[in-house]
């Protein structure tokens, strides 16, 4: 927030569980109250859990489904209701993953949720296009974040197997989203923009 304000922007923060419909509704209402309207939506909340398929537990799956699917679905639904009333169109981006496109060891459950996000965006083209709202996904591959860098081998491993020689940065992912939210992408909808340095083209497993 400090960075946004320091660079001339404005923002509001709503803290809560992204899988809680009450929180989702309050977030959307806060945006309307603070800024007057909603033009752009990014559904970025998500969690990753690794696990052997044969050992995966119901509690872990429910948590994945709640955050990755329930939260994204109802954020888009609530925001789209506002955008529909405004009658001014808009753009929506959902965060997917390369695991929604391609099999990955130990990520069967996570990949399932991200494939569902991909299909959600495609299906919502039917509902949102008549309203002038486009909806797309960004599917990151290996990305350098505070969490991924906790693995001391992450950078070297993914640099070795990524055709472009390095993982993505957070900025790489953000700029892909900015493009899909921009007027330059106004006739793009129902698509997935994969940002993975070419990894899915060759599909070399890190394991």
Model features per residue range: what roles?
Residues 52-53, 60-65, 158:
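Substrate-binding pocket helix/loop in short-chain dehydrogenase/reductase
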Residues 53-54, 102-108, 130, 165, ...:
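Active-site loop immediately N-terminal to the catalytic Tyr-X3-Lys motif
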Residues 76, 113, 121:
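Active-site helix of classical SDR
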Residues 81, 85, 126-130, 186:
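Alpha-helical segment proximal to the catalytic Tyr-Lys
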Residues 97:
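Residue(s) in the substrate-gating loop at a strand-loop-helix junction
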Residues 102, 178, 189-207:
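Short C-terminal tail/terminal secondary-structure segment
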Residues 130, 137, 156-188, 195-197:
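C-terminal helical subdomain
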